């Protein structure tokens, strides 16, 4: 079968920004990542049916290297350092670090174990491969036509929103965050190009570096949960892991890439660590779980308490959004904050078929468990309930849901 991934740039920008910090600050870190499908009951056929094709695609993925024009593109990004690009010139994913199989319960199991400078780069590629293999078996012309109809409806809706904007209103800004859950690369490129060409004043960019390069648009992204989670197992007190992660980020980027992720141990615990120093240094915050209105109001109260003008800060929302949800949030917060929206599945896999809700998350670092305690029930992630309970205790977080 033909390869799904053709370029190592076909991933999200934050993989490069996080990898650069890992390479510079803790390159010897060992990590384990584990795959989960959160909606197995919704699949049309068992995911294990794609196993042979998946292994073939992984073989191909691990033969890819960065091309010279790709390296030159990365060098032009001001926050990417030259020694990091030199490292990428030699980079190749190693097949021995990733294993796809069937687990004891008959489910698709994917496990990545190896140096973090290798392991962390598999995630987006693997999720995109799983999605495309799954949907290619149930692909029809009618599905594509329905996707196109929905895409045109989205573009028309944005144009209505643009007309509703008052002359002095802050801009309504939307980005594509959909690589990991996309229907296919071809469809994602089609969607991103359509948004870029049709609503350029609203469409801010894409998280996909290859598409940003090919379409000459802005690549978007800063950090993901795995970056902060890794510090739970590094040489800092567990209570201080968030502060250590944010400080390390600041040391690396010196003011660039200033959107902090808040829900590794929940918003309340995050704000206890997000003191005046960090609140001034970081450009804003990203919401990825929990009630977005409650979250934004907490952020507003926190900045006000620190006597920081919230109109100088940005809130980025990226949790299960569609355009109407984003527009409502924009209306609610636009007079207090700069606001932007990262939309994933609803942009790149809204075809009339039920999307896969799949993740490939960091569960262990340097032999020690790590965990995410989400602001949303069902998004908490760990392989070790004992560590999860300890983490809750350290950060004074009540147990609201089961880890998955």
UniProtKB/Swiss-Prot annotation:
Q: Its Gene Ontology molecular function terms?
A: nicotinate phosphoribosyltransferase activity
Question: Which InterPro entries does this one have?
Answer: N/Namide_PRibTrfase, NAPRTase_N, Nic_PRibTrfase, Nic_PRibTrfase-Fam, Nicotinate_pribotase-like_C
Q: Which residues carry this modification: Phosphohistidine?
A: 225
Q: Where are the transmembrane segments?
A: none
GO BP field: NAD biosynthetic process via the salvage pathway
Q: What class of enzyme is it?
A: ligase
Pathway in which this enzyme or protein is active: Cofactor biosynthesis; NAD(+) biosynthesis; nicotinate D-ribonucleotide from nicotinate: step 1/1
How is it modified post-translationally? Transiently phosphorylated on a His residue during the reaction cycle. Phosphorylation strongly increases the affinity for substrates and increases the rate of nicotinate D-ribonucleotide production. Dephosphorylation regenerates the low-affinity form of the enzyme, leading to product release.
Which is one Pfam family of this protein?
A: NAPRTase
| Reactions it catalyzes | nicotinate + 5-phospho-alpha-D-ribose 1-diphosphate + ATP + H2O = nicotinate beta-D-ribonucleotide + ADP + phosphate + diphosphate
For this entry, the protein name equals Nicotinate phosphoribosyltransferase
